[in-house]
Amino acid sequence: QWSSSAASDVYKRQYRNNVYFLGMGYDILRLQATKCKLLVDGEVMEGTGYFQKVSVQAPSFPWFWGMLHFDDGSYLDWFMPHVTPMWSARDDEPWRLRDFFRSPNIGTGVFHDRKTGNTQNFNNCTVELSKQNSPDALKDEKGKPLPEFLVKVWNEESSANIRVRAVSRARWVFDQPTRASWVSHLTYNEYPLEVISINYEDSEGSRNESDYEWIHGNAEHAWGVLH
């Protein structure tokens, strides 16, 4: 069910064609934020949703991605594909010894501020990944520590520093036969997030998690390479 704000351009469907070289890249069609209703065991629940459809015409390399929705209708996302020794991983086991280095390929993000109506497009993004180590640290169903993400996105006018942790883990494993009996592998992880802190600064001031009633989000982390 659409909210009244869906008429604004920032809440309409957005399409982008991203070509890197030799015609290779990806297409993405998405709705950044919309109000939704869900029926679960006869109970009606309300929330916000993000929808996307992606078509890829290139090898799929490791990436980080995340999206946060705010109670006032604002949203923030980040995306950082990267080069890492984890491209050679052949299974879904996290926290490998080889997972010690990540060089960003590109980094982008966007923050739409519902209060001011301004949208900031970020051309820089860094993501640091660590194991949860607090007394209430969470683990997945295999007993592996869930990750904590430290994210920074910025441009010349504004910046956001975000600290979030995963509360559970869903994953999909892809094994693609290729040439000479070689099998390429990709593990795609998805994590519902708990926001620990967020600090956003621009020319109009600063905001943090205490300025919002709630912030909910989701993150992706993929490793391996699918070709």
Language-model segments: residues:
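Structured soluble/peripheral alpha/beta segments that form catalytic or ligand/cofactor-binding pockets
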Residues: 4-227
